[in-house]
Design a protein with these regions (language model features):
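Conserved small/polar residues in nucleotide/adenosyl-binding loops
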Residues: 125-131
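Mid-chain, well-packed structural core segment of small domains
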Residues: 57-99
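A short aromatic-anchored loop/beta-hairpin motif
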Residues: 97, 105-113, 117
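Histidine-anchored nucleotide/phosphate-binding helix
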Residues: 14-30
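A short beta-strand-loop structural module common to alpha/beta enzyme folds
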Residues: 34-43
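Charged helix-capping and loop-helix junction motifs
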Residues: 19-21, 51-56
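Short, glycine-rich nucleotide/cofactor-binding loops
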Residues: 3-18, 43-50
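A generic structural motif
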Residues: 30-35, 66
């Protein structure tokens, strides 16, 4: 099964990603093909250059061809992107200060990026945080 994660809830990247999902990806026990991850709000902070979780994730993402994206508005607010709020959603905002392979964007850019490798549909009645999305 192919899935994409959306990290939206408070500390999802610290707790669910850092202590559960990432270790499973590293030891190949996650049992699904994660094709992408999308980060909102303070969850993007784990992707700053030098952050141990972000550096580990960047390595896995490169190996597994996983798409990593941060919300462009969230990144602009935290000075982790070059661009303006008016450019958000257009694909013009560029991530900065983040681990290798991370891009900034909004849902239109996420859908375009994952389109060729789209996740499988998932039942939204069984969601846990971080959200498993079918995009």
């Amino acid at each position: 099964m192919k899935i994409a994660y959306v990290f939206k809830s408070n500390m999802a990247s610290t707790f669910q990603l850092g202590t559960m999902i990432l270790p499973q990806l590293e030891d190949n026990s996650h049992l699904v093909n994660v094709v992408g991850m999308f980060f909102f709000d303070d969850n993007i902070m784990c992707l700053q250059k030098g952050n141990p979780v972000g550096e580990r994730l960047a390595k896995i993402a490169k190996e597994k061809k996983m798409h990593l994206m941060v919300c462009d508005q969230c990144a602009v607010r935290r000075e982790l992107a070059e661009g303006t709020f008016e450019q958000c959603g257009s694909g013009e905002v560029k991530a900065k200060g983040l681990v290798d392979g991370v891009v900034a964007g909004c849902f239109p850019q996420l859908y375009s990026a994952l389109g060729p490798n789209a996740p499988d549909p998932v039942s939204y009645t069984h969601l846990t945080l971080p959200t498993i999305c079918s995009v």
